Amino acid sequence: ESEAQYIHERLEALLKMLPAGTVIHQQNFYYTDRYHNTEYSTNALIAENNRHLNSKEILNNYTNLYVTFTNGQRNGKIRKNASGTSLMRKLHYPFKQPYKEYQERLTEMEAFLMNFENGLSSIQQFEIRKMDDTELNNAIYDYINLSYETPENDATQKSVNPMAINQNGTMKIGQQYVSILSLTNEGEHLQELAVPHTGKSKAYGGNIEMPDSIRSKCSMLYPVGLGLPFNHIVNIVIEITDADATVTAIGAEKDALNYITNFYPPAAEKQREQEAFCNEITQFDYQTAYTAFNVVLNDHDRTSLMRKTALVQQGFSFMNQSACYVENAELCNLFFCNIPGNARANYRGFINTTKQAICYLQKEGMYLSDEK
């Protein structure tokens, strides 16, 4: 627990070093596989473990972390909640022409990015490796093609599976149906670590042996991350915002509610919450952020996908009674919003602080052994 607190403090300090407009995108991939270990060991315990676990179904996980940046100008509005839809605003499409003079901005950001990379490397509990251009291209392909369970080595010779969307909002990539669930209401308390709530392992289907109860503390996203024994992706997007601009925007929204507080009591309650938030930012010098969190599901069978969607909804409720929204009309739009490098386009988010946003990151590498 002390190590988790240390990691949390280090990450908070690293994010404070980044300028406003920087976007941190953690993309976690989970997929099922079978355990195979052909290594011979003279250690009786290791040999027995390998024999017992061999050919059993397991859940694999790997994480990619992307850092993107903007031109640094404060000419955009501060986004405050998850209610906006990009279909009502100007189009956000990936890989459009970079803004003017981005080479100069890249030179400015180089020192920040180097410090961030060195800071992550210095955390003993982490092991990171910078992607080269080929690996980055492969990662983008694996996400768009939903082939993350078999990562591609050279995507330049590959074509993405055809995509189709019908009038009901159902989306298919190749032969796989896609579903996205976005976090819209945070739970009452955010914690660096929490003893996770878990459902019965039989409810998840499959042959992966999941623990019915866990006594050790895990990252807050465990119920929708390692706690779901089927293929899925979890995206966490943290955009560093300017604290002064954020407080000003929230203050303006608070003032706009003055006209309805007399006949609509919830407006007065919201004003009190907004004032308390702004006071906390000012008093403790917190770094503000715009945070988005979603889960991407894919399955060849639509009925199976619906069952998995229900299990993810349950997982959100286990995450401190958080609430999620099952995307329909915005499904395709949000899928493209989470392409590596395009995460700033994700509009299903909310304002909080980096101290709170870091709680959503997956910070552990977990190995759960069989009780036998």
Which residue stretches match the model-derived regions?
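Extended, folded cores of ATP/NTP-driven motor/assembly subunits in large transport
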Residues: E1-G365
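The Walker A/P-loop phosphate-binding site
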Residues: G365-K372
